């Protein structure tokens, strides 16, 4: 292709049915940045191993050598995966970036499986190899407390209860729901997950003390302010991404420095954009898929709190932050693969690799919680809360039966009855036409007979 010639992307050359995808124009530039560099990575890896083998003296510290050997094994696996793993649906800022997080997902799942197969004591004490400060019970903290918005008992600062809630978790909630909105790309699903999680906190506050919050902290601070504002900003960003022109040109083909800087900045934006149209009420398959997505989202959210509790990790520990960063990077790819698999199963015949491993991670985390502290999760839920959940599940089942079975059967019956009526009316019309002709012929014969 000639230099500077624009072409449409392959995704637009073969549009998938029912897809809402923006048009992409690319000049086809394939620079050193985009190549796989498999030989280069293999050469660097070999040089590092040769250096460790021949030039570096191995220390006589069993614990240190064990840790270093495990880290080296993980790094070799990451090098292999980054260069050889299959590409996912995302290509920006670079396909290798998303291959890296796919391999990190595999490593994390293997780590969870290892923890799952340990005893409760050994699993908690194993965390000391990662951080010597871990492996000790968490101190008890007080939650809930005074829930007055305006406290007349503190005349100097009557709104102290509100200011006490203004900590680092407020921007974390906002940023988290902003990113979740970019993953899900649907306002209704985001709001349902946000409200449902608050109901879960209400229902499980007898198991985890940090779920015990004031009513205004649940519904005003969380749902309306933090989550709601994050969802609103996320939807505005989605609107901009859906309207943004996707025209890509090689960096060295851009004449001005301003254009080059702008091109570098846009490297961290999507290559193309697909608007998610979940349409859960369109058929039973999509309805069950959306319910499954909401369930897995809520389970992953609960795992965040329960894992900290059963593994004795304080909320401010860096491993908790690393887990959140991990899900931020793998969640978007997993949601895109789930949507592709659900929206066009004929083209995407199997669930994507990132979605598969994320689902396995979520289930494994929950199994660790079940094994390490079954007494906590088996604490009986209050009866009135159980009644509310039974009522909600019953309403979902009734609506599902009505929408996808009773309603469809009724519509099919009405359509069949209408067609039968049309067929019978056509038959009556066709039978009445010959009888009319015979009467007319009979009257003409009688007239001729009289004339004769």
From Swiss-Prot:
Residues 419-452 are annotated as: Disordered. Its main location: endoplasmic reticulum. It is a multi-pass membrane protein. Its EC number is 2.7.8.29. Residues 1-35, 91-99, 308, 371-376 are cytoplasmic. It is found in: Endoplasmic reticulum membrane. The chain crosses the membrane at residues 36-56, 70-90, 100-120, 287-307, 309-329, 350-370, 377-397. One of its GO terms (molecular function) is L-serine-phosphatidylethanolamine phosphatidyltransferase activity. Catalyzes a base-exchange reaction in which the polar head group of phosphatidylethanolamine (PE) or phosphatidylcholine (PC) is replaced by L-serine. Catalyzes the conversion of phosphatatidylethanolamine and does not act on phosphatidylcholine. Can utilize both phosphatidylethanolamine (PE) plasmalogen and diacyl PE as substrate and the latter is six times better utilized, indicating the importance of an ester linkage at the sn-1 position. This is Phosphatidylserine synthase 2. It comes from Danio rerio (Zebrafish). The lineage of its organism: Eukaryota, Metazoa, Chordata, Craniata, Vertebrata.
């Amino acid at each position: 292709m000639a230099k500077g010639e624009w072409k449409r992307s392959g995704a637009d050359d073969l549009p998938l049915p029912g897809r809402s995808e923006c048009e992409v124009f690319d000049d086809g530039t394939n620079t050193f940045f985009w190549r796989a560099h498999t030989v280069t990575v293999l050469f660097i890896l070999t040089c590092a191993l040769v250096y460790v083998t021949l030039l570096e003296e191995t220390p006589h510290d069993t614990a240190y050598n064990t840790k270093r050997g495990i880290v080296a094994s993980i790094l070799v696996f990451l090098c292999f995966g980054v260069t050889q793993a299959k590409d996912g649906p995302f290509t920006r800022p670079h396909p290798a970036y998303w291959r890296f997080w796919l391999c990190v997902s595999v490593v994390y799942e293997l780590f969870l499986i290892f923890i799952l197969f340990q005893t409760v004591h050994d699993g908690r004490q194993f965390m000391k190899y990662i951080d010597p400060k871990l492996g000790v019970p968490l101190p008890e903290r007080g939650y809930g407390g005074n829930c007055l918005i305006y406290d007349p008992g503190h005349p100097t600062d009557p709104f102290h209860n509100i200011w006490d809630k203004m900590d680092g978790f407020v921007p974390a909630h906002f940023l988290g729901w902003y990113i979740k909105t970019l993953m899900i790309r649907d306002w209704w699903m985001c709001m349902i997950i946000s409200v449902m999680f608050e109901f879960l906190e209400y229902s499980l506050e007898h198991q985890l003390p940090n779920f015990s919050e004031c009513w205004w902290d649940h519904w005003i601070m969380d749902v309306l302010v933090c989550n709601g504002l994050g969802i609103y900003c996320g939807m505005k960003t989605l609107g901009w991404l859906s309207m943004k022109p996707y025209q890509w040109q090689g960096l060295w083909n851009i004449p001005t420095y301003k254009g080059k800087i702008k091109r570098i900045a846009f490297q961290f934006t999507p290559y193309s954009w697909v608007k998610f149209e979940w349409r859960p009420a369109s058929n039973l398959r999509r309805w069950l898929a959306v319910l499954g997505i909401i369930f897995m989202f809520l389970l992953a959210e609960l795992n965040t709190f329960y894992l900290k509790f059963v593994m004795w990790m304080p909320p401010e520990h860096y491993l908790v932050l690393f887990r959140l960063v991990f899900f931020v990077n793998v969640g978007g790819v997993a949601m895109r693969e789930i949507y592709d698999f659900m929206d066009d199963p004929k083209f995407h015949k199997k669930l994507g690799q990132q979605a598969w491993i994320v689902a396995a991670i979520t289930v494994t985390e929950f199994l660790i919680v079940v094994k390490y502290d079954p007494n906590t999760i088996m604490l009986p839920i209050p009866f009135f809360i159980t009644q509310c959940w039974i009522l909600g599940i019953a309403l979902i089942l009734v609506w599902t039966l009505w929408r996808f079975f009773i309603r469809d059967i009724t519509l099919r019956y009405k359509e069949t009855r209408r067609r039968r009526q049309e067929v019978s009316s056509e038959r009556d019309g066709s039978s009445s036409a010959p009888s009319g002709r015979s009467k007319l012929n009979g009257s003409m014969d009688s007239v001729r007979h009289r004339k004769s």
